[in-house]
Amino acid sequence: MSTYRSPDRAWQALADGTRRAIVERLAHGPLAVGELARDLPVSRPAVSQHLKVLKTARLVCDRPAGTRRVYQLDPTGLAALRTDLDRFWTRALTGYAQLIDSEGDDT
């Protein structure tokens, strides 16, 4: 589904618990696939597939380190996700304030 905007892909990617666990681990610093797989209940190839989804969603990026690839959180993708969340939160608070104001008008 390549028509989604980047934040939509990010939200979709984070709907999976294993991918959320990977993001949480990477919040502590860069790690290679093997290091990530060590503490997850899935195989190393499965971790690689999850990382591919996270990379497509721009939540992680990678760099070569010898014979390995090291993954880290992608600040650009996380910023887009934060902007999307802030926009949602602002709309929710505005709606709540309007509801409170309208209930006050009824009394």
From Swiss-Prot:
GO MF annotation: an example? DNA-binding transcription factor activity
Residues annotated as DNA-binding region? Answer: 33-56
Annotated CDD domains: HTH_ARSR
In this chain the HTH arsR-type domain maps to 1-93
- Which Gene Ontology BP annotations are present? regulation of DNA-templated transcription
Tell me yes or no: is Repressor among this UniProt entry's keywords: yes
Query: Which Gene3D superfamilies does this one have?
Result: Winged helix-like DNA-binding domain superfamily/Winged helix DNA-binding domain
**Induction record:** Negatively autoregulated.
Q: Does the keyword Transcription regulation apply?
A: yes
Q: How is its activity regulated?
A: DNA-binding ability is not susceptible to zinc, nickel, cobalt, cadmium, lead, copper and manganese ions.
Keyword vocabulary terms for this entry: Activator, DNA-binding, Repressor, Transcription, Transcription regulation
Q: What is the stated purpose of this protein?
A: Involved in the regulation of lipid metabolism and hypoxic response. Positively regulates transcription of various genes, such as phoP, groEL2 and dosR. Negatively regulates its own transcription. Acts by binding to a specific palindromic sequence motif in promoter regions.
* PANTHER family assigned to the protein according to its UniProt record, in alphabetical order: TRANSCRIPTIONAL REGULATOR, ARSR FAMILY (PTHR33154), TRANSCRIPTIONAL REPRESSOR SDPR (PTHR33154:SF33)
Q: How does it assemble?
A: Homodimer.
Protein name stated in the entry: HTH-type transcriptional regulator Rv2034
Write down the species.
Mycobacterium tuberculosis (strain ATCC 25618 / H37Rv)
